[in-house]
Amino acid sequence: MEIVWEVLFLLQANFIVCISAQQNSPKIHEGWWAYKEVVQGSFVPVPSFWGLVNSAWNLCSVGKRQSPVNIETSHMIFDPFLTPLRINTGGRKVSGTMYNTGRHVSLRLDKEHLVNISGGPMTYSHRLEEIRLHFGSEDSQGSEHLLNGQAFSGEVQLIHYNHELYTNVTEAAKSPNGLVVVSIFIKVSDSSNPFLNRMLNRDTITRITYKNDAYLLQGLNIEELYPETSSFITYDGSMTIPPCYETANWIIMNKPVYITRMQMHSLRLLSQNQPSQIFLSMSDNFRPVQSLNNRCIRTNINFSLQGKDCPNNRAQKLQYRVNEWLLK
């Protein structure tokens, strides 16, 4: 009955319904990309050009397993072999440095504080490397992934690498079974997620107003970032920034987390430039959705358990439509 309750809750929250440029040296253009059309009045490649300006980024244009995507709930299939996620912090709180990268708010954990994740669709254990925030200039946009065509105000992405097979995230990002990204949608509310509250309170967020600003955070409990649900959606995709390697397994949690309107306003006041340059808000730092190309969208939400408690039989119908879609 727990799964039934979650699905019905998300129905009310509108979250889940019952469930040719010149080719130059890669090194020259390593950081030469942007999300928006204009950066200080000069041309910097926006997402539609990422794969054209750098031969090492060609997957951004020609890849068939790119991210983010629009999750159509009618295309989800229940996978009984998806186990619950297991987060191992060693029973300790962690420290990390929060950065304004000019494109994201990024939190990188100190190397002595290891947080591993396993279970779900994973065969191997993966180690948390970075937490990244995407958010919009308006509440109606900001997330990279969409749900039935709907965007959320933001998206938290926890980027993990396969530490059993690879020595670091750089090596893993280029390799099979290299990355797992846990994605959590953000909504604006009167209350705030405890973990995000630590990151976004005024005393903290104002320390990283400009590009390259950094601030140390201590005593963080990673488990507080996760919403109270064991349900998720998963698919095979890519990183959403150049070079768009198709080595990421995405796990999208079935409930959002919340931040206050003031905290969202503080995010929108972050600059993608340095103090000596013109102010340009970091907001709208998301890549447009990419074609699904018949990839399978799996979930551990068992629609068939809803029975008579569900106000309609849409979930049961979804199962049959999913099966037909996969056979096409």
From Swiss-Prot:
InterPro entries: Alpha_CARP_X/XI (IPR041878), CA_dom (IPR001148), CA_dom_sf (IPR036398), Carbonic_anhydrase_a-class (IPR023561). GO terms for molecular function: carbonate dehydratase activity; hydro-lyase activity; zinc ion binding. PROSITE patterns: ALPHA_CA_2. It comes from the Eukaryota. Residues 31-301 form the Alpha-carbonic anhydrase domain. Does not have a catalytic activity. Belongs to the alpha-carbonic anhydrase family. This is Carbonic anhydrase-related protein 10. The lineage of its organism: Eukaryota, Metazoa, Chordata, Craniata, Vertebrata.
